[in-house]
């Protein structure tokens, strides 16, 4: 043992020599090896701390000088040792929970809760993937145990003893079948006993349950007597009867267009009479076309007047020409011309209807200041 300790001390001088000395340790002394590794890590920590103190004493002005001279490999070994310790604790926790699996599931202890709290404490120091994987493995194990523990819960909420309920119900209504063992309740229960049983149960049940008011509908007629049903019309029978009697539906009569034509001719003659009256009253003054046909109070009546005046022009009772202001005027033919032979336009007369919109009608009424229609209504 002394030789082995001497070889370990020599290993502290160099990295290669230390590695060779560790290999020569036999497998039976594994625990001693682990203890010596922990002592070596502690010695490294002391060495790092001493180096830091020395640098801070020599150069107190430069605060970051001590940290800059620390070997990164030493810090790496310290972190590796910390992570190794966390993994060891996780494995020990998983092993303990697996060994106590039956006690955790079948008893009402808080072992699973305590194990979860311990895992939460370990997880605060986890910084690498290997330790996080062990934490996930423990959580999977804990969730399985929690599921099994929930299945073993004994809940009496859904338990219902029908036999005991029937016995209590019989005693409540005054029928105790258990007093006479020789009596068969199914064979000796007559209709009167059954009726009395249900009446008692109904009376006690209604006293505990508030009864809702009856609902009445107010739809339909308020008359006391019922409405008489209308007889259904048999359309098919009526059609057959009409075919048997030879009755045919009334045909549409042809539209009588002659009546409309006569009404148009009468209106044209009436307007022509008004125009000739004006010509006789003012023989030398032609009448303005717009002042004659425009009705300031009715646009539809104005359109009708234009339509009727076109027939007067077509039949040669008057003509339209433009005055010096380029506005249309109406003149009688028999005043300016002696006969039809002297009228160069007699054989080339044409009928035309001007277009007039509602806005044009308003503008003409405002421009000519027409306040009263020259063609009065006949109705």
Swiss-Prot record:
Entry GO terms, CC: chromosome, telomeric region; cytoplasm; nucleus; Smc5-Smc6 complex
Primary residence: nucleus
Localization annotation: Nucleus; Cytoplasm; Chromosome, Telomere
Gene name in the database record: EID3
Assembly and binders: Component of the SMC5-SMC6 complex which consists at least of SMC5, SMC6, NSMCE2, NSMCE1, NSMCE4A or EID3 and NSMCE3. NSMCE1, NSMCE4A or EID3 and NSMCE3 probably form a subcomplex that bridges the head domains of the SMC5:SMC6 heterodimer. Homodimer, and heterodimer with EID2. Interacts with the C-terminal region of CREBBP.
Function statement: Tissue-specific component of the SMC5-SMC6 complex, a complex involved in repair of DNA double-strand breaks by homologous recombination. The complex may promote sister chromatid homologous recombination by recruiting the SMC1-SMC3 cohesin complex to double-strand breaks. The complex is required for telomere maintenance via recombination and mediates sumoylation of shelterin complex (telosome) components. Acts as a repressor of nuclear receptor-dependent transcription possibly by interfering with CREBBP-dependent coactivation. May function as a coinhibitor of other CREBBP/EP300-dependent transcription factors.
Entry coiled-coil feature ranges: 32-58
Keywords, sorted A to Z: Chromosome, Coiled coil, Cytoplasm, DNA damage, DNA recombination, DNA repair, Nucleus, Repressor, Telomere, Transcription, Transcription regulation
Pfam families in UniProt: Nse4-Nse3_bdg, Nse4_C
GO BP: DNA recombination; DNA repair
Protein name: EP300-interacting inhibitor of differentiation 3
Keyword Kinase: no
Family membership noted in the UniProt record: Belongs to the NSE4 family.
InterPro entries the UniProt entry points to: Nse4/EID (IPR027786), Nse4_C (IPR014854), Nse4_Nse3-bd (IPR029225)
């Amino acid at each position: 043992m002394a030789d082995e300790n001497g070889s370990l001390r020599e290993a502290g001088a160099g990295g290669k020599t230390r590695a060779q000395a560790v290999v020569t340790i036999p497998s039976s002394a594994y625990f001693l090896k682990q203890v010596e590794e922990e002592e070596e890590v502690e010695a490294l920590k002391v060495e790092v701390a001493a180096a830091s103190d020395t640098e801070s004493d020599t150069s107190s002005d430069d605060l970051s000088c001590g940290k800059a001279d620390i070997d990164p490999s030493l810090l790496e070994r310290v972190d590796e040792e910390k992570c190794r310790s966390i993994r060891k604790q996780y494995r020990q926790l998983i092993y303990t929970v697996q060994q106590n699996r039956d006690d955790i599931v079948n008893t009402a202890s808080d072992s699973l809760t305590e194990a979860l709290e311990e895992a939460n404490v370990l997880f605060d120091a986890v910084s690498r993937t290997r330790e996080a994987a062990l934490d996930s493995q423990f959580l999977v194990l804990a969730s399985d145990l929690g599921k099994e523990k929930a299945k073993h819960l004994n809940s009496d909420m859904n338990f219902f003893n029908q036999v005991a309920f029937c016995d209590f119900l019989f005693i409540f209504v005054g029928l105790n079948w258990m007093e006479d063992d020789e009596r068969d309740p199914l064979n000796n229960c007559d209709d009167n006993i059954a009726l009395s049983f249900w009446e008692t149960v109904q009376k006690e049940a209604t006293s505990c349950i508030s009864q809702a008011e009856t609902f009445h509908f107010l739809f339909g007629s308020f008359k006391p007597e019922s409405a008489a049903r209308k007889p259904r019309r048999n359309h098919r029978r009526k059609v057959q009867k009409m075919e048997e009697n030879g009755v045919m539906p009334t045909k549409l009569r042809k539209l009588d267009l002659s009546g409309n034509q006569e009404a148009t001719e009468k209106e044209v003659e009436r307007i022509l009479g008004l125009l000739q009256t004006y010509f006789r009253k003012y023989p030398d003054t032609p009448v303005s076309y717009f002042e004659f046909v425009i009705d300031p109070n009715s646009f539809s009546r104005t359109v009708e007047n234009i339509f009727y005046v076109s027939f007067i022009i077509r039949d040669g009772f008057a003509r339209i020409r433009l005055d010096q202001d380029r506005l249309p005027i109406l003149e009688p033919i028999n005043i300016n011309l002696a006969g039809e032979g002297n009228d160069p336009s007699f054989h080339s007369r044409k009928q035309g209807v001007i277009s007039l919109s509602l806005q044009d009608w308003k503008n003409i009424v405002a421009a000519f200041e027409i306040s009263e229609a020259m063609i009065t209504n006949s109705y």
